[in-house]
């Protein structure tokens, strides 16, 4: 069966046999900045942002297996925590950490359910969407030989064809944010991501929300699009069969925001220091010196490629 990419993408990631429901979880295929020592540096940066904004709790939207939530606790964040994802509560989370099972993609959990899991009002919380928007399925379109923008359809083996013309709000979005009439050019229509992000702000009403992701802005849109697949640490052909992650970069400038900063700027403003510790500490406290070196290494990883180029899209709820 051949269907629009957006529908196939949703089923491949979040359906009953979807990639994000697999027992090994995403970490079985790739790591993100939420893992290991880098995850603790990211957590410290988020704690700094929460402190500046007055947020008392944190909700991790697209929480995976709870890696960032665990990192937040490990760096001393004492406020309420809750995670939202498509799987049941992961083993090993601290007992006081809330968990919500959601449908996945742009289908959000009910705000009352999230509030109950967090144990405090969402208006006092920071919602973190780390690499969530890039896996919110969106319409994949391509300009045909006549200059018309048409949906790209795909079958279970990844074979594509051009389908119906893009119309309505989706076409309006493309004309405003990603205009092109070059035959063969691709457009990943970000309307679904814009709407999902707006729903987080308008339905959940957090004190602040931050979307941390890779993406592009007007003038840097890739003419061939960015749809990609990852499996077992490798880039593979995008096939919507549930065996691989499917992702596309985010049109950052179309998202509602109060501020957009780079990942590197976020670390410099709110995160741990990347300055080497005094070498004299190695003689008086060797273990502390080694721990400080590890912290600096993690901070420098966040400052460098690729995480330093990620965007932090910050908005009030």
Language-model segments: residues:
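Rossmann-like AdoMet
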Residues: 1-104, 108-122, 141, 279, ...
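Long, Lys/Arg- and hydrophobic-enriched amphipathic alpha-helices
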Residues: 34, 48, 171-317
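Active-site flanking residues adjacent to catalytic metal/cofactor-binding acidic residues
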Residues: 59, 84, 127-130, 212
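Short, solvent-exposed loop/turn segments at secondary-structure junctions
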Residues: 89, 133-134, 215-217
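A mobile, often basic/glycine-rich helix-loop segment
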Residues: 125-176, 224-232
């Amino acid at each position: 069966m051949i269907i629009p990419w957006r529908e196939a993408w949703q089923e491949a990631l979040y359906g009953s046999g979807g990639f994000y429901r697999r027992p090994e979880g995403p970490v079985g295929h790739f790591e993100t900045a939420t893992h290991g020592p880098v995850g603790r540096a990211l957590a410290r940066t988020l704690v700094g942002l929460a402190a500046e904004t007055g947020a008392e709790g944190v909700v991790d939207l697209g929480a995976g297996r709870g890696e960032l939530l665990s990192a937040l606790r490990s760096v001393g964040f004492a406020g309420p925590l809750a995670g939202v994802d498509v799987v049941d509560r992961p083993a090993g989370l601290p007992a006081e950490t809330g968990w919500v099972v959601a449908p996945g993609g742009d289908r959000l959990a009910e705000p009352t359910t999230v509030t109950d899991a967090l144990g405090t009002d969402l208006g006092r919380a920071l919602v973190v969407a780390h690499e969530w928007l890039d896996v919110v399925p969106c319409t994949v379109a391509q300009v045909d030989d006549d200059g018309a923008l048409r949906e790209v359809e795909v079958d279970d083996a990844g074979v594509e064809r051009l389908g119906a013309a893009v119309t309505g709000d989706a076409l309006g979005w493309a004309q405003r944010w990603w205009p092109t009439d070059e035959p063969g050019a691709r457009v990943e229509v970000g309307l679904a991501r814009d709407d999902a992000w707006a729903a987080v702000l308008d339905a959940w009403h957090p004190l602040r929300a931050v979307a941390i992701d890779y993406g592009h802005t007007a003038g840097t849109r890739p003419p061939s699009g960015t749809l990609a697949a990852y499996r077992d640490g490798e880039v593979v052909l995008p096939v919507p069969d549930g065996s691989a992650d499917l992702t596309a970069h985010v049109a950052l400038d179309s998202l509602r925001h109060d501020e957009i900063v780079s990942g590197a700027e976020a670390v410099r403003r709110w995160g741990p220091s990347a300055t080497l510790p005094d070498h004299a500490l190695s003689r008086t406290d060797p273990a502390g010196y080694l721990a400080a070196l590890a912290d600096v290494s993690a901070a420098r990883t966040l400052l460098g490629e690729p995480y330093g180029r990620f965007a932090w899209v910050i908005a009030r709820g």
